[in-house]
Amino acid sequence: MGVRYTNRAITTEQQIDILKERGLLIDDVERAVKALDIISYFRLAGYWRHFEADHTTHQFREGCRFADIIDLYSFDKQLRALLFTAIQTIEVAVRTKIIKHFALEFGAFWFMDENFATNEARFATNLAVIRKEVERSHDDFITEHFRKYNEPELPPVWKTLEVISMGTLSKLYSNFSNATAKHAVAREFGLNHHKFFRSWLECLAVLRNCCAHHSRLSNRVFPVKPKMPERMPNTWIADFSFREQTLYPQLCFVYWLNSIVLENTFITDFKQLLISHPSVKTRLLGFPRNWEQEPL
């Protein structure tokens, strides 16, 4: 059983004193105060945990500098922006491909028909969430639809799927009963089986939320492991010794999915980001030792 929390709020200057007492080197106290006033102590704490020698006493390793923590934070912030840009492209394409392949064969309202679901309970849950997400939408094409039509209760799939969340979209795809249609969508992204695409969509929804809510990516353990095919039709990875719940495999599949657009500069942009932040260690992202020798 836990104990009552009794700590009081302290000033930014007092926070700086605590960090100094724990062995962190702070060259410019004034800049450090400004940084903490903008970023906040506990948001940065997730980044400096890697620099601690002891996670119980929170003593820092010898030679650790506040500037290195800020550099890691800055790298992480820019990486989120890079990923979010790629995910936006992927997300729009996924919606379009699912609408295209499912609607032509299964109609405009397949998402409301439990005959197209593998699990009835998940179908009911998904539909309830879709209703709420559509109700919350203020997009012109949704409000205009309801102004004109009152049946069925929801707009057709080519409107509805544009306003549901990435997580809901992932669950809809996963619970769809027709494997042939799911394969068709997966093949649009260069995958030979929908099980990989289903897994990647689930991971993508989590990763998207991390980026959208400014959550830390480096040194993070993700809740879902992406299924990684050993062979692909184009250049892919050969070393699968990485830790599955780190960012590295997610970066790999984001690059692959983003290849649906011709101007895919994701790897080039990522490498440039690493060059701009030489103090950042790729092992914090789960990269294998010889990642630069990978075909991808």
Residue ranges and their predicted role:
Residues 214:
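Acidic/aromatic/glycine-rich contiguous surface patches that form carbohydrate-binding/processing clefts
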Residues 1-206, 218-296:
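Extended intrinsically disordered or low-complexity regions, especially N/C-terminal cytosolic tails and loops
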